[in-house]
Amino acid sequence: MLRTESCRPRSPAGQVAAASPLLLLLLLLAWCAGACRGAPILPQGLQPEQQLQLWNEIDDTCSSFLSIDSQPQASNALEELCFMIMGMLPKPQEQDEKDNTKRFLFHYSKTQKLGKSNVVSSVVHPLLQLVPHLHERRMKRFRVDEEFQSPFASQSRGYFLFRPRNGRRSAGFI
């Protein structure tokens, strides 16, 4: 007579090794979901370094399980579960990133004056570095416009460039 144990297919050692981290991941995700109670919350009791470490551990665990394709049905369920958990928990920024962002936003319009030249510091916004070039192009354009003017152009040009705020025109431009 054959025993029922001998009829059962045995799982290879690789599946057992993959099942224990899978169990740990499911326990971790169940613990996070139990604390959530239906609405995503932030881990408020953790320091920023601890939040970043927790995020990295969850990310590493999810990526390691998603790379193992032993069971396609389980990997699809794990993938959905990992994406759901990763979507609920916002990724904490490192402290250096926050400091750099604040420093950039505060100092982006500052310039360093060395002697007679205006040297733009490295934290200036890239678009603000183009302002001197725009001024040079505008001056070149006005020089070209002056060369090709008719006798009547100076009257209308004076009105548009030197119009007083109160609406009156000076005697030189009439």
From Swiss-Prot:
One of the Pfam families matching this protein, by short name: NMU
Residues that bear Methionine sulfoxide: 139
Compartments, as annotated in UniProt: Secreted
GO molecular function, one term: type 1 neuromedin U receptor binding
Listed SMART domains: NMU
Entry keywords, A to Z: Amidation, Cleavage on pair of basic residues, Neuropeptide, Oxidation, Secreted, Signal
InterPro entries assigned: Neuromedin-U_amidation-site, NMU, NMU_C
Tissue-wise expression: Expressed throughout the enteric nervous system with highest levels being found in the jejunum.
Family listed: Belongs to the NmU family.
Protein name: Neuromedin-U
Organism field: Homo sapiens
Lineage, top ranks: Eukaryota, Metazoa, Chordata, Craniata, Vertebrata
Gene: NMU
